[in-house]
C-alpha cells in the first residue's frame, strides 16, 4: 500500500506542475488524515512539496481560495458549510453543480445546485442594472452562439450533458498522465514495478516539470480559465452561463401642461427598463390633480412601470384652489347612524389650500366655535364639489353626542381653520345601544308622587316627580364619579330616585321626571346670578358660560345613563317648569326674549341628545302654563304660544330633526275655580288658537288641534300638572272636575298622560285656597279619591257618572269622541 500511496503522491506533484483539468479534490480525497505523513515521506528532500505550493498559490489567487493544499480536513477556526448551500464563493468546495454567472466578462455570481436537485433545477432570474440595456437570455457561450435559456427554464439536460463531458474529460486526463484503467491484478503488478523505479528516474521527471513551470512564467501565460473553474468547484461539475443583453429602445414622453409649468425632474424619454415616478407640475391658483393618458381625464397615471413600451402623451389635470374660508365647505348632515357612530357628510366646492392633503372633522366649542380637537381626517377630493364622509366612534366619549362639529383644514403643525358651518348631531337616538321601545302604560291616568304606596293605592299608571339639581349636587352620601370630556365630576347617586324608578318599572308604571335648578348654595355656579325677584322659585341654565355648560352637559349625560337602563328607566324628561313664566320658574337674567329662547333651547337640545343617545325611545318635553295668548302675572313672562313657536323655530335651526314634545299645565282659570265647564267668560276660552286667551281643560282641544296642525301628530302632549280644588264648590265638584277632565284627555288621541297635582292636600296650598289632594291634610279620603282610583277602569261610570250628572249635567256632549272603550285603554288614534 505504501508504494501505491507514493505513486499517487508523484501523480499529484505532476498535476500541480503541469496544467490539468483534473480537480485537486479528486486527488485530495485519496488522503486521510493519517496518510499525510506518508505523502510527506515522498517529498523528503522538500523540493517537490515546495514546487507544488507555488503552483497552488497561483490557482488560488485566480479563484480567491486559500493558499494551503486541501486535505479534506477542517481547520478549527473555519465553520463547516452545508453541501446544499445555494451560493458559494469562488474556490469554495461543495457537492453539486457549480453554476458560474458571467456578464460582460465579469463573474457576477456563483452558486451550487446539489446533485439531488438536478431534475428540478431551473435557470436563474434575469440580471438587473445594466443601464440602457434589457436582459435577453442566458447562453452557454459568451458570444451568444450557444444554447439559450430563459429565466425559469429547466436545465436538467444541461446538467446531464455537463456530467458526461466531465466524465469524458477525467478519462482523457488520466490517460495523459499515464494512467490506464486495468484489471486489479494488473494494478498490483504496476505497484511492484513502481517500487523498482529508481530515484534518478523520479528526479528527471520532476526536473522536467519544473522546467515547464519556469517556461510558463517566462512567457507570461496562465493556466486555462476552464481549469481554474474546475478547481474552484471542488467536488462539483462547473457550468458557466453568460448574460446576453440587447440595447433598450427609448420612447418619447410628451407633456400637455394646460397652462402649467412642468417639474424639471420629469424625463422626456424612457426605456422598458426604467421605472418612472412622475413629479407634480405647478400652476398658480390651481391644485394639480394628476397626470392622465387621455384628454378626457379618464385614465390616471403616476408611474411608468418597468417593462412598459411605447411613446406617451400625458395630460395635466387641474382644479381651482381657494384660500380657507368659513363657507368653503357645506355640511350635508351630522347625525347618528348606528350605535356609537356619528356620520358626517360634507361637500367641498373647491380644493382648499392647506399645509397637508387632508380635510379634518373637528370638535368645536359650542359657545365660541373654536376648534377643541380633531376627531377624524380624510384625503382631500381632487375635484370641484368633492364629497367627503367621516365616521366617528363615540364609545367612551358621551360629550360627542351633545357636541358640535365642523370641517377644518390644517394651517400649521398645531393650528386649524374651520371651513364649514358648525352643526350638532341629529338623530341621537341612533347612537344608543339600548333599542328598547317607548313604554306605553295601560291608561293615561297619573299622579305626582315620590311614594310608591300612593301610586299603587290610587292604581295610577304614570308618575311624575321633580328632580332638583341640588339633589344631584349633594355630597353628604352616595357620591359617584363621572368622566365627561376629559374631566371627572362628582354627582350624587340619587339612590332614592333609583329605587322609586325601579319599583315603577317593575309594576308597569310610566315614569316622568322634571329637571329644575332650585335656589341653593350648590347650584350657584349654574345660573347667571341671583334673581332680584322674590317670585323666583327656579332658575335656568347659564349656557353662555363654557364651564357651566360643560357641567350641565355632564349632568345630563350622567342622568341619561343612570336612568336609561332596562331595569331603571325614565320614559319622559321635562326641562324646567312653566318656562314661559321666566322670572318665576326659569330665570336667566333680564335678557331679551330671543336670548331667553336661545338659552333655553341650548339646554333643551343638550338634554335631548344626552338622554336619547342613552335610551333612544326617551321623550323630552318643554313645559308651558295655560296663559296661551296672554302673559302671566310674573315680572318677566311670555305667552305660552309665543314661547312654543319661538322655541320650535330655534331648536329646529340649532339641530335638525329634534322631535320635541309638550308638557302642558291645563289648570283652570282662575286656579281656585274647579268648574271649568261653566259658560263664564266664554270669550277667553275659544277654539281658535289665534285668539283664545287661555287654554284649559275647558278648551283643551284647541291646543291639540293647533299642535297637530302646526307640528304634526308625532309631537306628543302630556298634561303633566293640573289640579282641582275642593275649597270652593265642595268635594263633589272637585270629583266631577277630575272625572270630566280625564275623560276629555283619554278620548283625545294627541294626549298621552293626564297627571293630577297631589295625593293629599298640602298646608301651604290650602292657605291659598287650593285644596287639590285626593285626601285632606289629615289623610281622610275625599269624594275625589274613589273617582280618581277607578275612573280609568272598565267600571268607570259606576264611580263617576253620579257626580258628573249632578255637577255637570250632559257631560258626554263635552267629551269629543267619547266611548267607554277609550276610557279604559291607552287611546292614541
Mark where each language-model region is.
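Substrate-binding cleft and catalytic face of glycoside hydrolase catalytic domains
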Residues: 461-481, 486-630, 669, 761-766
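Secondary-structure capping and domain/repeat boundary segments
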Residues: 85-189, 201-321
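Aromatic-rich peripheral "rim/lid" segments of glycoside hydrolase catalytic domains that contact
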Residues: 584-585, 728-733, 737-829
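Boundary/entry segment of secreted carbohydrate-active catalytic domains
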Residues: 419-469
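Beta-strand-enriched, solvent-exposed domains that form extended recognition/catalytic surfaces
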Residues: 322-433
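Noncatalytic carbohydrate-binding groove/subsite architecture in carbohydrate-active enzymes
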Residues: 596-731
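Sec-dependent N-terminal signal peptides of Gram-positive bacterial secreted proteins and lipoproteins
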Residues: 4-24
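Sec-dependent signal peptide cleavage junction
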Residues: 18-40
